[in-house]
Each structure stands twice: as C-alpha cells, then as structure tokens.
Amino acid sequence: MILDLAMHDYDLRGVAQFARRAESLGYGCLWTSETQHDPFLPLAVAAPATSKIKLGTAIAVAFPRSPMITAYTAWDIQKASAGRLILGLGSQVRAHNERRFSVKFESPGPKLREVVLALRAIWECWQKGTPLRFKGQFYSFDLMTPFFNPGPIDHPNIPIFVAGVNQYMCRMAGEVCDGLHVHPFNTAKYLREFVHPAVEEGLRASGRTRQHFTYATSVFVVVGENERERAANAEAVRQQIAFYASTRTYAPVLATHGWEAIGPELHKKSLQGDWQAMGQLITDEMLDEIAVAGTYENIGRKLRERYAGLLDRVSLYQPYEVAITDAQQADLVKQVNGG
C-alpha cells in the first residue's frame, strides 16, 4: 500500500514548493481534483519541479472536455514529468454536467468507456504514426495531420483510472482501464463484496489479473491529539458522510450494509437545507465503518490493517482543520507503506 497526498493548495504560485515538499516527505502521488480549480494546471507546474512523485487527477470531469483536448493536455504533462502522470477521469453526476458545465449527460458509463478508448486511439496515432480512425457512438476522430500531431514521447503509456461507484463503472474499469478511483464514501465491506467482484469480472474479460490493476481512494480519518479534538473532528466527518449518503448515486454503499432507509431521509433533509440534522443521522456504526480513527502515531497502521489487499493507494480525507508536522507526515508514510 502507498500513501498519497491530495493537493489542498491550488495557488499556482505555491504549487512547485508544495509538490517538492510532498516528494521529500515520501508521498507516492500528488492528486488534484476538479472542484474549485482546474485539475491539470497544478500538475503542469509540479512536473518540472519534481522528479519522483507521481502526479494524478482524482478526478478530472470527462465530458465537458473533448477527448482530443484531454489527450493533448495529458500528453504534455506526461512528457514534462518523464512518465509520472496518472490520468483519473470521472463522469460526475447529471446536475453538474448539465447545470455547472452545460453539457449533455447521456449514458455516462458507456460514454466514459468510449472516452478511454478514444484517448488510447489518439495517443497511438501520435506515438506510432498510424492513421487516426476512431468511430464510436458518442465520439468520432479521423483528422490528424502532421501540423497538429505532437509526435512521440519517451513514456507513451499513460495509465488511466476512472471513478466508479456502481457495478457498470467498476466492471468497465477492470475491462479497459489501469485503475479505479473508489469514492471516499466507502467501506471495507463494500470494497470486498461489491467493488472487487465487479472489477474482477472486467479484468477477466480483458484477459488481465489483479496485479495489472490499481485501487486508489481517499479514506475518511478521524485524527486528534486528545478525545475532545477527536470528537470535534468526528462531527465534521459525520457531516461530510451525511452529504454523500444523501446522494442517490452512492446508494450501493448503503445497500451493502443494509442502511438503505437512511438515504431517502438524508436526501429529504438536504432539499430542506437541514444540514445539521443530517449529520446527527449518521450513527456510530456508520462512522466506524466508513472512517478510521486514531492518532498520527497509529492511523497509518490502522489504515493498512483495514484495507490490506483491498486498496493499493490511499490518501487521507480530513474535512476539518489539520495540524501535522513534517516528522509526523514522514512517519505516516512509513506506517502505510509498511516501512
């Protein structure tokens, strides 16, 4: 298992320093997300400033960009980083596609699968000089003259991860992708009984095995130096869990544990804007299954014990103010990595 770091400072003026520090502390990958900022720009800044740490998107929203645009961006970052990019893509939900990005939302699973295949076809054209002939249900690409072709690079095999919650996405990830970004709203039971079987089905269809595939996620952790601090941070985690559990997309996680009844109740309260009451509906059992609690001296070992064999790359999800020293971070990396 490898401990990664989710970027929390998106000011491009400080990205290089942040990335170098993450690399020096031993983190395996620096992940960006597409929430308030572009996910690719920080990686372009971090690439020439570092030499070992991997650089990834967790995730970039796939459909607002043409696969051609994504292909160019990923190709350039892969070249600048000497092969350290992990391209993470996700479909997002209907509301964000249609109302935040103003793009059509249709058949998200098959369409995301086609994005992956289109990217590979475009990159093969650039790397090998083969004609670009991609024809799918949603995308078609057949024009690539030398003037627009960036040409081959030293590390052309860019790993693609997709975000998945439901069975189709997990199976599709196993069939055509290199890894799966598991949503932070997860449990070990959900991973073991729902996610892994679906991915394995896809891997078998592609003729590959588990060793060819990577599971990555951010894990909710409740960390504090004393009981009072941990209790306050636990409440912040409850609130975030309630937010995710109110979204119907994540129903498979609830169903795995027999918690289906709480989903509609949370959704109703979210429509009413009753956020405080939502957190109170998250039971201690749910909190214990979804989050890992402890101190920085033992949380890494607890993560490793719970998710050994289920996850390959993890980062900490802490929706509260974090105070951690460089020494604690370096030790945490060793705990998770088994050092």
Name each region found by the language model.
Residues 1-339:
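Active-site-adjacent structural elements that line small-molecule/cofactor binding pockets in enzymes
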